[in-house]
């Protein structure tokens, strides 16, 4: 038990000058983070601030390019998840990494089950120890129950019991309340207090300010992959934390636009989904860029997938040019002039293994075929026209799309859907993971599309992008529209407050 006897003012884990670079992106730049025994440290920052990369470094999934990690003052190298586990670091993710077809006890002790003297798994000892761990955290379910029989909250308890089973000194909780009910969240808070009393150092990642200020003892703020500030949560307020999160300069100058809005092209009313969103309604005009902002779990991407027919809402009406349309599939959406550029280009956007030109022309084969036969020359011409419009950088259009950079893959996806001649284009995180030059090119092209009368919906987690590109912004929180913001009200602080459910600052409340 010597792991837990450190003084409360001596960090269990220290990360110092940690740097991590991916192709074209510096994810972490000289960041530091200290975790203390018996205390909760909230790691705070916008989407893309470097929180997830930090967690992956601490859990041995990524290795830093520079800097030092110390545990109880001694430098360590965490090359693998096993190294992190052996060092007493465990993570409980928003989506628990457990196995539905195994029992509770098997999930708790997978990889380190007690053994008999003959080397066989000692099932009696495993269930006995599992029962003790579950009792310790107030989990009432049976150790022999299959995980598939449990709800999300109880699966979290299994993950926590697993962390305790390896005598973890550091417990990382990454958005642990995202899928929990109010009652389940309260139970999780009680469990956090139990872990604190046991001397665990807890890294708590959340976008919800109310829970940060309720359970955290310390805070650390990252912004754009860099350390901003840390300290005691009792020494700051929500206003100060918001300013630390968003107080950065815009990366580049966004294109100037003189929005000339046309008639209403899309109307959404009463959209609802059993688990993702409810009460959604908005309109969109030709030539308009409508931004959607929100935090993790807000339901933005899920709403866009419903608009495009990937999923079906349980209720709601879609009108296009004033006429009610029923969209049951992506084909229905495309036929009605709605296209969707997804966030996950590799899985949903491009077809790896096919050449660039075929990726661009896939949804438009009717335009490049005659009597059921493809006309290769027409297919190449269509692909070349849109590739040139987007300044697609490729050695040849017949090369595998998988060989392109992220930015150029994004251009292929946009070209593919523009070739269908849509009325509405939905861009989900259009510049995520691409370099600054490609970002600027995508922004210029978005402005050009709007200028030509195309209606654009942009989902983005980057506040400068949302403000710099949008005519209006709809902020979503927990599956509902929290606010619609435009004009002088469109500020970083306003967006963060609405997204996190924070009341306006006193000076901004009208008299």
Curated annotation (Swiss-Prot):
Q: Tell me which CDD domains the record gives.
A: ABC_Carb_Monos_I, ABC_Carb_Monos_II
How it assembles, according to the record, is:
The complex is composed of an ATP-binding protein (RbsA), two transmembrane proteins (RbsC) and a solute-binding protein (RbsB).
Q: Where does ATP bind?
A: 45-52
Keyword Translocase present in the record's keywords: the answer is yes
What does the record give as the organism's lineage?
Answer: Bacteria, Pseudomonadati, Pseudomonadota, Alphaproteobacteria, Rhodobacterales
Q: Which family does it belong to?
A: Belongs to the ABC transporter superfamily. Ribose importer (TC 3.A.1.2.1) family.
Return the PANTHER family for the record. Answer: CARBOHYDRATE TRANSPORT ATP-BINDING PROTEIN MG119-RELATED (PTHR43790), D-ALLOSE IMPORT ATP-BINDING PROTEIN ALSA-RELATED (PTHR43790:SF3)
Source species: Roseobacter denitrificans (strain ATCC 33942 / OCh 114)
Q: Name one GO molecular function term.
A: ATP binding
State the EC number(s): 7.5.2.7
Under what name is this protein listed? Answer: Ribose import ATP-binding protein RbsA
Superkingdom in the source lineage: Bacteria
| Residue span, ABC transporter domain | 13-249, 260-503
Q: Which reaction does it catalyse?
A: D-ribose(out) + ATP + H2O = D-ribose(in) + ADP + phosphate + H(+)
């Amino acid at each position: 038990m010597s792991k837990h006897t450190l003084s409360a003012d001596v960090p269990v884990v220290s990360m110092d000058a940690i740097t991590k670079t991916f192709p074209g992106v510096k994810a972490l730049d000289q960041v530091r983070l200290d975790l203390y025994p018996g205390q909760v440290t909230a790691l705070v920052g916008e989407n893309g601030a470097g929180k997830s990369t930090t967690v992956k470094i601490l859990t041995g999934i990524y290795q830093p390019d520079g800097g030092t990690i110390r545990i109880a003052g001694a430098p360590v190298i965490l090359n693998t998840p096993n190294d992190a586990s052996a060092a007493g670091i465990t993570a409980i993710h928003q989506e628990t990494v457990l196995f539905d077809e195994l029992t509770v006890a098997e999930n708790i002790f997978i990889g380190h089950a007690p053994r008999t003297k003959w080397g066989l798994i000692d099932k009696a000892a495993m269930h006995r120890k599992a029962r003790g761990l579950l009792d310790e955290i107030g989990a009432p379910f049976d150790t022999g129950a299959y995980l598939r029989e449990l709800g999300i909250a109880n699966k979290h308890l299994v993950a926590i019991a697993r962390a305790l089973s390896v005598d973890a000194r550091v417990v990382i909780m990454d958005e642990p309340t995202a899928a929990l009910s109010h009652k389940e969240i309260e139970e999780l808070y009680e469990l956090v207090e139990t872990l604190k009393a046991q001397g665990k150092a807890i890294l708590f990642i959340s976008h919800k300010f109310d829970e940060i200020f309720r359970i955290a003892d310390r805070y650390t703020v990252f912004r754009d992959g860099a350390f901003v500030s840390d300290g005691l949560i009792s020494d700051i307020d929500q206003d100060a934390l918001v300013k630390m999160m968003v107080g950065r300069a815009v990366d580049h100058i966004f294109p100037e636009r003189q929005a000339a809005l046309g008639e209403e092209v899309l109307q959404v009313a009463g959209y609802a989904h059993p688990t993702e969103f409810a009460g959604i309604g908005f309109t969109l005009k030709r030539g308009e860029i409508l931004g959607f902002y929100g935090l993790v779990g807000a339901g933005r991407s899920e709403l866009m997938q419903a608009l495009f027919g990937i999923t079906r809402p349980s209720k709601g009406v879609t009108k296009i040019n004033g006429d009610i349309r029923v969209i049951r599939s992506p084909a229905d959406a495309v036929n009605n002039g709605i296209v969707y550029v997804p966030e996950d280009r590799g899985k949903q956007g491009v077809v790896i293994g096919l050449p660039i030109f075929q990726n661009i022309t896939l949804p438009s084969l009717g335009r490049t075929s005659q009597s059921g036969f493809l006309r290769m020359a027409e297919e190449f011409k269509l692909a070349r026209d849109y590739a040139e419009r987007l300044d697609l950088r490729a050695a040849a259009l017949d090369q595998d799309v998988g060989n392109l950079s992220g930015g150029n893959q994004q251009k292929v996806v946009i070209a593919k859907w523009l070739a269908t001649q849509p009325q509405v284009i939905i861009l989900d995180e259009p510049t995520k993971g691409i370099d600054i030059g490609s970002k600027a090119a995508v922004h210029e092209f978005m402005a050009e599309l709007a200028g030509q009368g195309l209606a654009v919906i942009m989902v983005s987690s980057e506040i400068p992008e949302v403000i710099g590109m949008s005519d209006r912004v709809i902020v979503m929180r927990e599956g509902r529209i929290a606010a619609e913001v435009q004009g002088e009200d469109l500020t970083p602080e306003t967006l963060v407050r609405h997204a996190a459910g924070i009341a306006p600052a006193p000076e901004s409340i009208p008299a």
